[in-house]
């Protein structure tokens, strides 16, 4: 699933290519992604200009003139490509194709159809039902040790579950949660309310560092993810624990272990993490 760094990479690619472009047409090739597609709403973006693009957690928000916003989630396997319209040949799972000025097309391909495209018309996209409960952004000053400690002391659930809770902090997905916990030497199975303030400070620092490094590498490609140019992310080459079950830890040579926490595969080093 595309996580925060991957969505941030897509956002930056879109900013470079589609800002100030006019939307000439939108072709919808499916009736349903995660939610049924409201074609009457989507056609409202036709003949409008793209003004701004933001990210909120794992969502893209595309601001369009006349106070319209597209809220897009890539789901498990969604890819957005910006290509030359004259060279476009439709392939399987191209569910939405937006034709833009300057011979550009924005193509949304999603084999598993867990993503969604929603149109917001009330001028306040952050109050939309899919965004309103989001917690703080991890790369902002609002995400700090005092904030995290205040949340951790309220729950005994495993620390990995807590830092992946979008109501607390958005966008720290499965890959980066495992990597940040390794970087801060904290076992993913620790009860949240046992984490000390010093450990919380280290964890906040690790989350920020890991996410920022992943963004500079264009995200992580395990299977499906590609950026707007169709290129993979290269952070896979820097993963210390994720996906490395039974391989030697780069730090201590102990074998990496895995277990399932809240239905998500979790990777850790029993020696380095306490």
Curated annotation (Swiss-Prot):
Binding positions (DNA): 93, 112
Transmembrane segments: none
EC nos: 3.2.2.23, 4.2.99.18
UniProt keyword Glycoprotein present: no
Catalysed reaction equations from the record: Hydrolysis of DNA containing ring-opened 7-methylguanine residues, releasing 2,6-diamino-4-hydroxy-5-(N-methyl)formamidopyrimidine; 2'-deoxyribonucleotide-(2'-deoxyribose 5'-phosphate)-2'-deoxyribonucleotide-DNA = a 3'-end 2'-deoxyribonucleotide-(2,3-dehydro-2,3-deoxyribose 5'-phosphate)-DNA + a 5'-end 5'-phospho-2'-deoxyribonucleoside-DNA + H(+)
InterPro entries: DNA_glyclase/AP_lyase_DNA-bd, DNA_glyclase_Znf_dom_DNA_BS, Formamido-pyr_DNA_Glyclase, FPG_cat, MutM-like_N-ter, Ribosomal_uS13-like_H2TH, Znf_DNA_glyclase/AP_lyase, Znf_FPG/IleRS
Active site: 2-3, 58, 264
BP terms from Gene Ontology: base-excision repair
Cofactor note: Binds 1 zinc ion per subunit.
GO molecular function, one term: 8-oxo-7,8-dihydroguanine DNA N-glycosylase activity
Stored Gene3D superfamilies: 1.10.8.50, MutM-like, N-terminal
Entry keywords, A to Z: DNA damage, DNA repair, DNA-binding, Glycosidase, Hydrolase, Lyase, Metal-binding, Multifunctional enzyme, Zinc, Zinc-finger
Keyword Metal-binding attributed: yes
Short name of one Pfam family: H2TH
Zn-finger segments (FPG-type): 240-274
Cofactor(s) needed: Zn(2+)
Taxonomic superkingdom: Bacteria
Subunit and partners: Monomer.
Similarity comment text for this entry: Belongs to the FPG family.
PANTHER family for this protein: FORMAMIDOPYRIMIDINE-DNA GLYCOSYLASE
NCBIfam families with a match to the protein in the record: fpg, PRK01103.1
Described function: Involved in base excision repair of DNA damaged by oxidation or by mutagenic agents. Acts as a DNA glycosylase that recognizes and removes damaged bases. Has a preference for oxidized purines, such as 7,8-dihydro-8-oxoguanine (8-oxoG). Has AP (apurinic/apyrimidinic) lyase activity and introduces nicks in the DNA strand. Cleaves the DNA backbone by beta-delta elimination to generate a single-strand break at the site of the removed base with both 3'- and 5'-phosphates.
Protein name: Formamidopyrimidine-DNA glycosylase
């Amino acid at each position: 699933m595309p996580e925060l760094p991957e969505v941030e990479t897509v956002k930056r690619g879109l900013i470079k290519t589609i800002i100030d472009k006019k939307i000439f047409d939108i072709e919808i090739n499916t009736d349903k992604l995660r939610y049924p597609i409201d074609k009457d709403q989507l056609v409202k973006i036709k003949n409008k200009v793209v003004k701004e693009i933001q990210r909120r957690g794992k969502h893209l928000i595309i601001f369009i003139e006349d106070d319209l916003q597209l809220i897009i989630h890539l789901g498990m396997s969604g890819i957005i490509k910006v290509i030359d319209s004259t060279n476009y040949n439709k392939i399987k799972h191209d569910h939405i194709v937006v034709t833009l000025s300057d011979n550009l097309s924005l193509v949304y391909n999603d084999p598993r159809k867990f993503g969604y495209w929603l149109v917001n018309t009330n001028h306040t996209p952050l109050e939309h039902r899919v965004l309103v409960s989001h917690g703080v952004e991890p790369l902002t000053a609002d995400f700090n040790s005092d904030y995290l400690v205040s949340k951790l002391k309220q729950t005994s659930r495993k620390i990995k579950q807590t830092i992946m809770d979008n109501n607390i902090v958005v966008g720290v997905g499965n890959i980066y949660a495992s990597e940040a916990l390794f970087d801060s030497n904290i076992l993913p199975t620790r009860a949240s309310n046992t984490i000390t303030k010093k450990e919380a400070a280290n964890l906040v620092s690790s989350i920020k560092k890991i996410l920022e490094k992943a963004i500079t590498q264009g995200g992580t490609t395990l299977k499906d993810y590609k950026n707007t140019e169709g290129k993979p992310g290269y952070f896979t080459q820097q993963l210390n624990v994720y996906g490395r079950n039974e391989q030697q830890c780069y730090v201590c040579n102990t074998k990496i272990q895995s277990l399932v926490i809240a239905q998500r595969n979790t990777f850790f080093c029993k020696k380095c993490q306490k």
